[in-house]
From Swiss-Prot:
Pfam families: Thioredoxin_7. SUPFAM superfamilies: Thioredoxin-like. Its EC number is 1.8.4.2. A motif (Prevents secretion from ER) lies at residues 167-170. It is found in: Endoplasmic reticulum lumen. GO terms for cellular component: endoplasmic reticulum; endoplasmic reticulum lumen. It comes from Mus musculus (Mouse). This is Thioredoxin domain-containing protein 12. Gene3D superfamilies: Glutaredoxin.
Amino acid sequence: MSLRFGATCLLSFSFLLLITSSDGRTGLGKGFGDHIHWRTLEDGKKEAAASGLPLMVIIHKSWCGACKALKPKFAESTEISELSHNFVMVNLEDEEEPRDEDFSPDGGYIPRILFLDPSGKVRPEIINESGNPSYKYFYVSAEQVVQGMKEAQERLTGDAFREKHFQDEL
């Protein structure tokens, strides 16, 4: 009787552990931090157009080693979390990657972080300045991401962006 009870308890505990465990991929964060307000690309473009905020788009794959290495650095960065409030944040994994060539300006490597203006246009001039020049949108550290976010914020928000954008339309 006690052997059966012990086996039942062990089985129940294992089941409980299985259903309550998480691999850090719940929600739209997909390991990059569920505390950040992530959107789909479609919803993000609509929100950016309505709010005037630029978009930050992360393109990654679930099986990618470099992507897995970046996730905890990104998710644990308080500075990225704070800066994310100034962007519409989009997280695209696996088959969510757009087929549009604008989303792979210098190749289809992963992970890539791209910045889009509020109209949804990819801004290829915003690159990882401290990264490999052959992979301009590849970021390996939270510090690099923060620098990219600050540059994008400077270029894509406020009067400087509106003046440049308005002149482009004339």
